[in-house]
Amino acid sequence: MIYTVSFNPSLDYVQDLDCVNLGYVNRTSGEKILPGGKGINVSMVLKNLGFENQALGFTAGFTGEVLKSMLRAKGVESDFIELDAGMTRINVKIRAKEETEINGQGPKISADALELLYQKLETLQEGDILVLAGSIPESMPQSAYMDIMKRLQDKKLKIVVDATRDLLVNVLPYKPFMIKPNNFELGEIFGVEIKDKDDVCKYARKLQEQGARNVLVSMAGDGAVLLAEDGSEYRAEAPKGTVKNSVGAGDSMVAGFIAGYLITDGGADAYRNAFEMGVCTGSASAFSEELATKEEVEGLYVKTFGKK
């Protein structure tokens, strides 16, 4: 089974405008509300690709109920811990000539609530996949990802971590199955400018040396790189298409990687297939108004790699 964790999920209020004039009344040309959060995005894309999974984390208030209802409508199973106070945050995504995001803080998460989540995670079984994605709210210890991996290190799970800076570096001693920094985040970790795929490979290898089993690095329009635990190195240019929405592309890449790996059941071509699926799923979401569908991913896969 696949599980995703979202400490601070959201409802994303997406507004389309021709332009934004600060200090004046602005009227939208369209709007919609979508489930949001990196772990939530991974769950929804996995479901779109045909992989059952369960979204875990925290919700609160009426917005939390709306979030759970929207996930049910999309066929995504969830088992959130309901907080006693506050409300699940609403993030505003403004799509005009430039994209602007206004993200809410979200509810406070108590130590008792966090312990309930830890106990839930301790019921996972050998071979399960756990995705830890996104930032950690200020009300929680910033060691939460590391604490989870430490508590689960003997359970033989495949844990995927999509986080930045210390949140990512601190989990490396616990040998995450896969990590997915982008090229800018990779440069931030080492205090360098990443200029090309050779640089990506150089510094991604350092993350492997620190414990990461597989390092997948997204490079937006410049493609992606995977350093696999079997010593293989994969590079790809970005698929061709018109970018309509950058939100969720990285999360979609994570979902695609997991799906591609599971399709081959860890066989000889598992990492190649995982990489190619990740690249195509991330791009398919970027080329779509919402998150990628299975049909969009399959079409882009054939177009990019010449096979299904």
Give each language-model segment a name.
Residues I90-I94, A224-L227:
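Short beta-strand scaffold segments in enzyme catalytic cores
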Residues E101-N103, D128-G134, D162, K180-E185:
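Short beta-strands and strand-loop turn motifs
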Residues L83, K93-E126:
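Conserved phosphate-binding/catalytic loop of the ribokinase/pfkB sugar-kinase fold
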Residues M1-G23, K32:
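Positively charged, low-complexity intrinsically disordered leader regions
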